[in-house]
Design a protein with these regions (language model features):
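Residue-level recognition of specific faces of alpha-helices
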Residues: 14, 44-47, 59, 73
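Short alpha-helical DNA-recognition segment
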Residues: 23-47
């Protein structure tokens, strides 16, 4: 169980790093995900970045495009 929590936190840290690299606030990132037809809020972005909210595949694909990142970057340094 602790390993899963650590992985969620690591993915969340990567989400935050990629969002900041893209020059976006949490609100801006949420708005761009919404444009792709996926319900999203700043609070959900915050929860995902803290590892407190699960990320579904459609959100991950949207963030990949928005952040101009590779899938590998989302999973870097998993513990």
């Amino acid at each position: 169980m602790a390993r899963i929590i650590n992985q969620n936190i690591s993915i969340g840290e990567n989400l935050r790093r990629l969002r900041i690299r893209a020059g976006l606030t949490q609100e801006q990132a949420a708005a761009r995900v919404q444009v792709k037809g996926i319900p999203m809020s700043r609070e959900i972005i915050s929860q995902m970045e803290r590892g407190a909210h699960n990320i579904n595949v459609s959100v991950l694909i949207a963030m990949k495009e928005i952040y101009k990142a590779s899938f590998d970057e989302f999973f870097e340094d998993l513990k």
